[in-house]
């Protein structure tokens, strides 16, 4: 099988290499030999490889730059991103090609960022930063998170990892997802349709769900108004999940105590945008769930796990469901 790894044109921090592939293959002894592996960066590299590649591993920027294209032998496409909403509609995907994402790559880093954000909010760090910028000395008293209620929307690898940390700190964890099946780290799980019932008792709201037609604008002005005074918000999902203006209004008015946001609409945030000056808001530049040291090695491990599943006729753990959007 010809497997091609295409690096992004402008982000060498997340490059693949032959050495990285060899290390991943050594961790998958069932892979066997006989594979031709190519690594490219330029458009010419891609054009040469895609003529014979049966599997392609790349990030979303490569898809946007080179698809649709003639890929006569392509069978498997593994995209090294978890959320593929920016690739919709998927009419660029060659017929019969199995599309996968890299969900699972981000879980460790996202979990740590999530619990860090909750601890920052509980200890009023966003407020401290606002006072620091203004040159104000003002004592602010934080509180322990044990016993506080955190509502986590989305219980995939990101939200589930945050739930694990939050439960370990003794928090009361409410999970929210389309299918309200129990989760080992949530005291209870409710369906998305029941979100309004949880918000009035939510001390911290965490958004970790994918962007789909059903979740776009999920946290609108009305739902922000359902949160209790002094609540905090964390968003590591997508900026479009939230009415940003309503969130900024609530922060500036002091109704919400703080927010930690890693995702925005648009990205990057333009100069002069109100997000830069909103009170008690921490801006993280969409890096919360990415660790350059482990990102590609974990992604390759997941790709090989899926390749072995495909080869043996089993379900692919990372197959992307276009209809559901994740």
Give the ranges of each region predicted by the language model:
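Rossmann-like dinucleotide-binding domain for NAD(H)/NADP(H)
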Residues: 99, 230, 236-326
